[in-house]
Structure formats: C-alpha cells, structure tokens
A protein has these predicted regions:
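Short glycine/proline- and aromatic-enriched beta-strand/turn motifs that initiate or cap beta-hairpins
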Residues: 16-59, 190-195
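Sec-dependent N-terminal signal peptides
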Residues: 3-14
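Outer-membrane beta-barrel "beta-signal"
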Residues: 91, 95, 182-195
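Gram-negative (and chloroplast) outer-membrane scaffold detector with strong preference
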Residues: 44-129
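Membrane-embedded beta-strand positions of outer-membrane beta-barrel proteins
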Residues: 25-29, 40, 52-56, 92, ...
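Residues that define the transmembrane beta-barrel architecture of outer-membrane proteins
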Residues: 21-23, 34-38, 84-90, 107, ...
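Transmembrane beta-strands of outer-membrane beta-barrel pores
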Residues: 31-35, 56-62, 98, 115-123, ...
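Extracellular loop and loop/strand-boundary signature of outer-membrane beta-barrel proteins
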Residues: 24-28, 75-82, 131-137, 172-179
C-alpha cells in the first residue's frame, strides 16, 4: 500500500502547479505489438536540440492469441484468450533533435529514450467488473523503458503533431498472465500544444 501511495504522490506532483513552467502538454495513442493505450505527457526544453519529457501511460495488454468471434444470430462478439492486465508506466526521459538548423520547414526528426517505474494491475480473468478489478486485483511494481525515433510536425496554431516508432521494455516480476515480460514494438501518435 505504501508503494501505491508513493506512486500516486509522484503522479500528482507531475500535474501540480509547481511545474507550470513546462513548455508543452500533450496526449496520444499507443498501438503496440502487445496491446494499445493512451499517454499523457509534459515536455520542456533545455535547448533547441534537447527536450525533457515526463509521461504517464495507460496500456491495455492483449494476449497474443486473443481472438474475437462474432455470433451472427445475435450480432454479439465474444473474446477468447482474453487477459485483464493494465500497465501504468510513469516514464521520464529525453528527446534529442539531431537535425536542428539542417532541415527547413516545420519537420523535426528526433530520437527518444525514457525509463521509469511501471505499475501492473492484474485483474481476474472472469467475473463481474467488481470481481475482476476490485475484489481479485493484484498489483506489481517494476522498472521499464522505451526507446525510439520519430518526428514532430509544427503547425501554425502552436500545435505539434508527433509520430514515433519505438520499442517498449516492460518486464514483469515473475509470470503474470503467462509471460514475464511484455516488450514489443510500438507506434505512437501524439498531439502537443504550447502551455
């Protein structure tokens, strides 16, 4: 319980007024080899070539053999090999822009590296919502990371659109839902705006 309290304090400090001097806020969509999710980030510049990032992600892990079958008589879909596992990475890292001043227009390629703690929420595989996510919920803490490349496209209204391709490093403490890691390739689409 102390770890969850520490984790929540860390998350709330990221969104507090004490760091209101950050240059960019943003959100986006993750589509990965092992699942999909959303991310929320804050970015601030150290120089034209280097930015620092903090982000929290909500990542819904999928079983590699998960399938959805449609019942044509009722129109209802059924999932098989479904797992209930949410990962909440809280990563900090940097974006490096190697081509500053070398590429014209509003296109800015970058390299990104992030690392930090991961809270894994493992719900039961069957039952009601309460039985899956409240009564039978297990949680674990580990450390993980991300590295990748991408590009920012700056628009005229102070919005930055980003696309990134990278690799998640998401280890687990032992076997959780059949695997001890959920590493995999990841494509990220993001939208940032100046604060």
């Amino acid at each position: 319980m102390k770890k969850i309290t520490y984790y929540l304090i860390l998350i709330s400090s990221l969104s507090s007024q004490s760091i209101s001097s950050l240059n960019y806020n943003g959100f986006g969509l993750d589509i990965g080899e092992r699942g999909s999710g959303l991310f929320f980030n804050r970015t601030w510049s150290n120089s034209e070539k280097l930015c620092f990032i903090s982000e929290i992600r909500i990542f819904d892990v999928k079983h590699p053999d998960e399938i959805i079958i449609q019942d044509y008589y009722t129109g209802r879909g059924y999932k098989f090999n479904d797992i209930n596992l949410l990962l909440l990475p809280l990563f900090s890292g940097a974006k490096y822009y190697p081509f500053v001043g070398k590429i014209a227009n509003n296109f800015a390629p970058f390299v990104s590296v992030k690392a930090g703690p991961i809270l894994s929420l493992d719900g039961a595989e069957s039952g009601t919502f309460k039985e899956k996510w409240i009564t039978n919920l297990d949680y674990y803490f580990t450390l993980g990371g991300y590295f990748g490349i991408g590009a920012d496209v700056l628009t005229s209204n102070q919005t930055i659109l980003s696309i990134r391709v990278g690799y998640d490093i998401l280890p687990m403490k032992g076997q959780i839902d059949g695997s001890d890691q959920y590493n995999g390739a990841l494509v990220r689409f993001g939208c940032n705006w100046k604060k």
